[in-house]
């Protein structure tokens, strides 16, 4: 089993993958996207899926604080639908990722004393790691299916 985690933003998608045992998540890279021009980095995702032999996708779902689905969560679901269309054999699941990017930024400031410029370069990848690690720790459905 190897899961791939996604932090889908409006300009970038952070990517993380799990180890083969589903215990830990590691950051892979940040893919630049352009929603206005329908460029979603799916060619690069395809390469990463083959490289890492991915068996499941986990996308962060940025719900509103009142648990409703806002525009960014809809965009994450649309990205998940594109993944399903491109990889029909690979299941997609979602996990609530409220405040994950805020947590990631706080971690970079407080623990790594990282400059603003450096934070912008790694924040989405770290958020993807946190999304996937939270999913692994919660033993989400894809961890139990033998994917």
From Swiss-Prot:
GO terms for biological process: rRNA 5'-end processing. Its EC number is 3.1.-.-. Pfam families: RuvX. The keyword Nuclease applies. Disulfide bonds: none annotated. InterPro entries: RNaseH-like_sf, YqgF, YqgF/RNaseH-like_dom, YqgF/RNaseH-like_dom_sf. It is found in: Cytoplasm. GO terms for cellular component: cytosol. Its main location: cytoplasm. The keyword Cytoplasm applies. Keywords: Cytoplasm, Hydrolase, Nuclease, Ribosome biogenesis. GO terms for molecular function: nuclease activity. Could be a nuclease involved in processing of the 5'-end of pre-16S rRNA. HAMAP family: Nuclease_YqgF. Belongs to the YqgF nuclease family. This is Putative pre-16S rRNA nuclease. It comes from Latilactobacillus sakei subsp. sakei (strain 23K).
């Amino acid at each position: 089993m190897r899961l791939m985690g996604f932090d889908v933003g409006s300009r970038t998608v952070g990517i993380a993958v799990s180890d083969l045992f589903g215990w830990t998540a590691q950051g892979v890279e940040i893919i630049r996207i352009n929603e206005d021009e329908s460029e979603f980095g799916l060619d690069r995702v395809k390469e990463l899926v083959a490289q890492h032999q991915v068996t499941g996708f986990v996308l962060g779902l940025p719900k509103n604080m009142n648990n409703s689905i806002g525009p960014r969560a809809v965009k994450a679901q649309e990205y998940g639908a594109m993944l399903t269309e491109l990889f029909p054999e690979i299941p997609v699941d979602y996990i609530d990722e409220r405040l994950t990017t805020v947590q990631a930024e706080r971690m970079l400031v407080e623990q790594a004393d990282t400059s603003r410029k450096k934070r912008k370069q790694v924040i989405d990848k770290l958020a993807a790691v946190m999304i996937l690690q939270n999913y692994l720790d919660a033993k989400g459905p894809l961890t139990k299916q033998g994917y």
